[in-house]
C-alpha cells in the first residue's frame, strides 16, 4: 500500500452541505439559425468539460441520491458500498466513455472504473447503462481465483462506478508489448494459458459467455497470475445463445459473430485460440491490418494469424482446434484445461509436448494389436475365443 500515490482528496459521504445532484450545463446561446444537431454538439462539449473535471466527479458521487452495491457471499447478496471508505488515486487507463483509477477501499488497493453516461445520446446511454447493469450482475456472483474480484459499485447518473480488486501488473497486452517476439518460454506460455482457460472454464460452468475475451481484458497481479476481467459485454448463455450482433473486438472475434450469425459459448474458445497465439508470439493478431480488414480476412477468407515455425506442434494443433471455422470442432474449456495440464506435466518432466500424445497413440495401438491377436486365438479346449479381459 505504501507505494501507492493518491490525490489529496477523499470521497466523503454527506459531510458537506448538500450538493446539486447534477450540475447544470451553462445556458447555450439561443440562435434561431443554429441547427438542432449543433445545439446538441455544444451541449455534449459542455457536458464533457464538466465530466472531465475531477471535482465534478467527486461532487456527483458525494450527492445523497447514490445507489450503491457491495458484494457479499451470504445467502442474501447485499450491496451497501461505503463511499466514506473510498479514496481515489491516479488514472491509469481510459476509454471513450470510461476511466479507471487506482484507489483504496476499506484499506484495500482497488481499481475504480468510472463510466460516463452521455445524456444527449439516447442509444449510447441505453447501451452503457445495460453494460453497467450486466457487468455488476455477473461479477457479483462470480468467485474464482482466475476471475477478477468484484468488490462494490455505485450509480449516480451521469457517473457509474465499479470497484474491483487492483491488478498491479496491468493487462496481458501491455505485458506482451514489453517482450521480444517469440521470447516467452513454454513454461510461461503454459502457466498463463492455464490461468486463462481455468477462469474461462469456470465462467462457462456458470452459464456465462464473455464475448470479448482478448489480451486487453486479461489482468495480471503481483504474482503474475492472470484473471479474466471486463464483463460489460458478457451475457448468460440462456439469454444470448441465439443472440446476433458483434459485441466483441474484431481481431479476436469469431467468424460467426463477425457475420452476425447465431453463436454459442464456442466464440470464447475461438478468442482463446487467438490469445494463445499471442502468448506464443507476443505479437498483436493481424498486425499490419486495421480491425475491419482483420474481420474481413477472417469472415471472408478464413484467414488466421500465421503460426511461427518455432511453435511446438502440439501447441499449434491446439490453437488450430480452438480457432476452427466450425464452432462444433472447437474444444470445450474443460478439454483445453486437461490438455494444457498434460502439456505442463510433460514440460516439468523434461519431455517434449508431443510425448504425451505419442505415448497415448502408441499405447492404444499396442492394445488394439493385442486385442486383435487375443480374439483371433482359439482355445485348444474350446472353440470359443479367449475373452479380451481374461
From Swiss-Prot:
Pfam families: PK_Tyr_Ser-Thr. Autophosphorylated. GO terms for cellular component: plasma membrane. ATP binds at residues 92-100, 113. Gene3D superfamilies: Phosphorylase Kinase, domain 1, Transferase(Phosphotransferase) domain 1. Keywords: ATP-binding, Cell membrane, Kinase, Membrane, Nucleotide-binding, Phosphoprotein, Serine/threonine-protein kinase, Transferase, Tyrosine-protein kinase. Its EC number is 2.7.10.1, 2.7.11.1. Residues 86-359 form the Protein kinase domain. GO terms for molecular function: ATP binding; protein kinase activity; protein serine kinase activity; protein serine/threonine kinase activity; transmembrane receptor protein tyrosine kinase activity. This is Serine/threonine/tyrosine-protein kinase HT1.
Amino acid at each position: 500500500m505504501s507505494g501507492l500515490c493518491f490525490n489529496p482528496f477523499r470521497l466523503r459521504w454527506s459531510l458537506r452541505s448538500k450538493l446539486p445532484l447534477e450540475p447544470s450545463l451553462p445556458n447555450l446561446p439561443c440562435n434561431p439559425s443554429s441547427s438542432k444537431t449543433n445545439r446538441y454538439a455544444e451541449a455534449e462539449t459542455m457536458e464533457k468539460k464538466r465530466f472531465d473535471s475531477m471535482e465534478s466527479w467527486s461532487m456527483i458521487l458525494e450527492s445523497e441520491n447514490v445507489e450503491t452495491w457491495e458484494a457479499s457471499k451470504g445467502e442474501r447478496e447485499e450491496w451497501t458500498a461505503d463511499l466514506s471508505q473510498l479514496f481515489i488515486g491516479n488514472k491509469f487507463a481510459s476509454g471513450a466513455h470510461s476511466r479507471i483509477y487506482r484507489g483504496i477501499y476499506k484499506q484495500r488497493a482497488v481499481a475504480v472504473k468510472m463510466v460516463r453516461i452521455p445524456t444527449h445520446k439516447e442509444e449510447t446511454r441505453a447501451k452503457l447503462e445495460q453494460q453497467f447493469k450486466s457487468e455488476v450482475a455477473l461479477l457479483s456472483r462470480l468467485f474464482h481465483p482466475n476471475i477478477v474480484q468484484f468488490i462494490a459499485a455505485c450509480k449516480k447518473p451521469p457517473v457509474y462506478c465499479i470497484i474491483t480488486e487492483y491488478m498491479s501488473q496491468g493487462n496481458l497486452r501491455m505485458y506482451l508489448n514489453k517482450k521480444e517476439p517469440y521470447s516467452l518460454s513454454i513454461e510461461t506460455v503454459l502457466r498463463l494459458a492455464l490461468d486463462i482457460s481455468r477462469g474461462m472454464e469456470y465462467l462457462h460452468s456458470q452459464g456465462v459467455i464473455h464475448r470479448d475475451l482478448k489480451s486487453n481484458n486479461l489482468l495480471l497481479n503481483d504474482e503474475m497470475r492472470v484473471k479474466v476481467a471486463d464483463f460489460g459485454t458478457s451475457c448468460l448463455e440462456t439469454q444470448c445463445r441465439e443472440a446476433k450482433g458483434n459485441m466483441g473486438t474484431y481481431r479476436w472475434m469469431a467468424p460467426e459473430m463477425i457475420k452476425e450469425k447465431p453463436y454459442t459459448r464456442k466464440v470464447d474458445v475461438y478468442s482463446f485460440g487467438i490469445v494463445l497465439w499471442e502468448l506464443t508470439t507476443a505479437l498483436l493478431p493481424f498486425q499490419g491490418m486495421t480491425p475491419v480488414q482483420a474481420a474481413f480476412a477472417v469472415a471472408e477468407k478464413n484467414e488466421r494469424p500465421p503460426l511461427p515455425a518455432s511453435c511446438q506442434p502440439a501447441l499449434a494443433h491446439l490453437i488450430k482446434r480452438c480457432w476452427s471455422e466450425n464452432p462444433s470442432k472447437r474444444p470445450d474449456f474443460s478439454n483445453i484445461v486437461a490438455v494444457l495440464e498434460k502439456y505442463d506435466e510433460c514440460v516439468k518432466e523434461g519431455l517434449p509436448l508431443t510425448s504425451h500424445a505419442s505415448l497415448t497413440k502408441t499405447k492404444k495401438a499396442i492394445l488394439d494389436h493385442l486385442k486383435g491377436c487375443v480374439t483371433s486365438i482359439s482355445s485348444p479346449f474350446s472353440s470359443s475365443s479367449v475373452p479380451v479381459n481374461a
